A protein has these predicted regions:
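Conserved polymerase palm-domain catalytic core
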Residues: 147-250, 254-275, 310-312, 352-359, ...
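Active-site and adjacent loop segments of nucleotide-processing enzymes
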Residues: 304-404
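Generic alpha-helical secondary structure
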Residues: 56, 60, 106, 110, ...
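An acidic intrinsically disordered interaction segment
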Residues: 61-86, 180-190
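Polymerase palm active-site segment centered on the conserved acidic dipeptide of motif C
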Residues: 245-248, 255-349
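Active-site-proximal segment of RNA-dependent polymerases
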Residues: 110-172
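Short, conserved non-catalytic motifs in the polymerase core
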Residues: 44-50, 81-108, 124-136, 198-219
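Non-catalytic, polymerase-adjacent accessory regions of viral genome-replication enzymes
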Residues: 1-70, 399, 403-404
Length: 404
């Protein structure tokens, strides 16, 4: 794909989406577009896109100039601000992760690289790959696994979840660049931009929080899934796949099939191939799931306590069973805690604080898409959810009136 001014403008627009009034983005808009915060606010009140388009035009010109300097040898890199990394503890798994904060211009170049790579990504990424990408999030994974489990012709009886150790951190930049060099050897400007962006990582791997990096790891994961689905065994002259279906969510892989021995064989093979070829490590802590039949799950519905539970695939914050889906216990505990506190707030002061309203809205999807009607009724979830939406709407109206 050739580098054009329109492509740079589209990348800048996507990078600035919902971020126009952040402090660092406003500084960048004034530096390269010559438009102040007051002018942007005035234009936003009357739905005038002129100042924003002026900013995007100025940023696109700067991006083109930096890429031209990079290609003709006048510069060694894109002259971006260093990436700021900071530790954060995952509230669910309690793992310590090194997240990254990239400057606005870094994000613009990341979106530009994605737009250039989009034809390749559309061709290479499998329909069963899910991550923090548009229309391919955790809800999409939940629906896909539900369709697999409830489709009788597939005959899925077992599942195995694998986890790539330190996926982003241990995915070397040389591996990603080698794949791109093989796939698009003639895209000189695109390879140069991707090389400079990947080199910004302080540890030699992929950044957690970068826009381009999420797509690059999914490109690497596509080779893993293709390899898994290609494993077959030959019986009486007929090739039978070892794995019926396979998918991924971020650094988690799931293998589903009819026989546990076949899935186990495929897992051993892919672990060795990933280690030897991609220099990544799949953890030895496999998670095996043996699904029950629909009749057995229906029979257990009438039992009490732990006897009522059925084995399920815990992935992407959901637990998928044969005939129903539940929420991961840790997520449900956090959601229940917030709804109980919101109920106390509503009873005490007749309104829900804004910060808690955002949390209630974010947890609504877990109640909506799972078998949790009894819990939702006990927590009065729908009433609290509507009250939270009203609080957010009222805060937005108040903020808009103050801006005028």
């Amino acid at each position: 794909m050739p580098l054009t001014h329109e492509l740079c403008e589209q990348a800048a627009l996507e990078a600035f989406n919902d971020k126009w009034f952040r402090r660092n983005y406003l500084a960048m808009a004034e530096k390269y577009g010559g438009v102040t915060r007051a002018e942007l606010q005035t234009a936003a009140r009357v739905a005038d896109m002129g100042p924003r388009l002026e900013v995007v035009h100025g940023i696109a010109l700067e991006m083109e100039q930096r890429i031209d300097d990079l290609l003709d040898g006048s510069a060694n890199d894109l002259d971006l601000d260093p990436v700021h990394t900071f530790p954060r503890i995952d509230g669910i798994s309690m793992k310590l992760r090194q997240l990254s904060d990239c400057c606005p211009l870094h994000q613009c170049f990341g979106h530009l690289a994605y737009l250039g790579l989009r034809p390749l990504l559309r061709a290479r990424l499998l329909p069963y790959q899910f991550a923090s990408i548009p229309k391919k999030g955790q809800t999409a994974l939940k629906r896909q696994v539900e369709r697999w489990l409830r489709r009788k012709s597939l005959g899925i009886q077992h599942a195995l979840k694998l986890d790539v150790k330190g996926a982003y951190e241990h995915t070397k930049q040389e591996l990603v660049l080698a794949i791109l060099q093989y796939e698009i050897p003639l895209a000189a400007w695109l390879l140069a931009v991707v090389r400079c962006l990947l080199a910004m990582s302080p540890n030699g791997g992929l950044l957690i929080g970068g826009y381009l990096e999420a797509w690059m790891f999914n490109l690497v994961a596509s080779y893993i899934l293709v390899r898994i689905l290609g494993y077959v065994k030959t019986r009486r002259g007929v090739s039978v796949p070892l794995v019926v279906r396979s998918g991924s969510y971020m650094d988690d892989l799931v293998l589903m099939g009819r026989r546990w021995a076949d899935i186990q064989s495929a897992a051993r093979k892919i672990t060795k191939w990933v280690k030897d070829t991609l220099h990544l490590t799949i953890k030895n802590s496999w998670v095996r799931v043996d699904f029950l039949s629909p009749a057995e799950e229906h029979r257990r519905r009438h039992l009490k306590g732990a006897a009522k539970g059925c084995p399920g695939l815990d992935m992407a914050r959901y637990v998928m069973h044969r005939t129903y889906t539940t929420v991961r216990p840790g997520i449900f505990k956090r959601a229940r805690r917030q709804y109980m506190r919101a109920g106390a707030d509503l009873k005490r002061s007749h309104f829900i604080p804004l910060y808690r309203s955002y949390r209630l809205i974010s947890y609504n999807g877990y109640f909506k898409g799972t078998k949790s009607r009894a819990a939702a009724e006990a927590l009065n979830q729908q009433k609290l959810f509507k009250s939270a939406k009203w609080a957010v709407r009222a805060a937005a109206i108040k903020e808009r009136s103050l801006a005028v």
